[in-house]
Amino acid sequence: MRETNGKNSGSVSPHAWRQETEGTFTAEHGSEAGRSPAGEWPTAGWSTAEPERMGMDSGMLADTIRAFRDRGVRSLVVVRAGMLVAEAYGAGLQPGTPQDVRSVTKSIVSMLAGAALADGRLRSVEQRISDFYPELKNDPKTSQLRIKHLLSMTSGLAWNNAGDQSSIEMMHSEDWVQYILERPAIHMPGRVSTYSNGDAHLLSAVLQQAVGMPLADYAQARLFGPLGITDYRWNADPQGIAIGAWAMALTPRDMAKLGWLYLKGGEWDGARVLPKKWVRESLQRRIVHHYKDGRKGGYGYYWWLKPLVPGLTGGDSSKPSPKLEAFYAAGSGGQRIFVIPALELVAAFTAESPDGEMPEELLNGIVRSIRSETPLQANPEAACRLTQAVSSFKAQPQNV
């Protein structure tokens, strides 16, 4: 196991961000449209840049980090246009410390489903689960269960989230997959959405059968290896099946790598890690989700989708504020990988907070620090404040 590094590998020239077709975003660098700044591909570690060089205000970032120091945040990493501009870690944590990301694991399972499709290990998302578990053919409901239903949590299998009852029962069972398969089918697949750790773990079991090896090994070969991710853990159930609903630990820098891969449409350093088509499909809204603040978002294939509060970014007030759409991986307690393609921004958080609104509030503070699409003038005083805020954050006791 090695610790990734964030050494600065070079300077960053002025560049402007532009939206490309089909929802992918690249950068313009000099006179060569589409060329991105140095450090875009952080396989060996993120290159760093002062926030001002990436159009961000160090002082505002410092204020945000200080404001959230006492709100249960354990660590945060901020990347813009392929450059690490800020990171902070609580006491006892280092950049190379893998942390429990909980249900962020589900989004990674979605990525692996895309890889399995690309490799021909799965025929399509229309493939029936009974191809892998023939006993499902005996029920008229479960006989119609397909991979797409597990990915969108519309299996129709009963799952009780009150007090995590079904998840706890599954964990106490001798065979987790058998527990899931024995759940009563209360809806036809595709009709009703129920957040289900059972659906995610059953998909992991299906993938493990499809690829013919432990899913953690497949993840290393097809996803983590190409991205240079080596410091991670992924626990398995009693039968050796990687737990699809939670149980992965990653470093925040590596969480940001996964977000960057998706921002780039599945491409990594000139290689196609995931099909662009899969990235688009997994981010397509399958389920409408109404947030508490009234905004309408959704759920794709284990990815959450949400429009952000308008008017967050600074800059030229004579120009209309861009409509910002985010997609993100989420785990309980505040684990997040946020991606905002229009800003070429990735933010990864780990936390232990009961406040469900905290992660987006932290993200909003980061977005507000974006003042320009071109570099700002260097601000040594603000840079000093940011350094102090990071040091103060590290001094804050954390429940690790």
Where are the language model's segments positioned?
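Structured C-terminal helix/loop/strand segments within mature extracytoplasmic catalytic/sensor domains
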Residues: 13, 17, 326-399
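N-terminal leader/targeting segments and the immediately adjacent pre-domain N-terminus
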Residues: 1-99, 117-123, 152, 374-400
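Solvent-exposed loop and edge beta-strand segments that line ligand/cofactor-binding
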Residues: 99, 139-141, 188-195, 243-249, ...
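Active-site-proximal alpha-helical segments within enzyme catalytic domains
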Residues: 199-206, 246-267, 335-352
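Active-site helix/loop module of the DD-peptidase/beta-lactamase fold
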Residues: 100, 119-157, 182, 211-246, ...
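Active-site Gly/Thr loop motif
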Residues: 229-231, 284-346
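Active-site SXXK
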Residues: 82, 99-125, 150, 203-207, ...
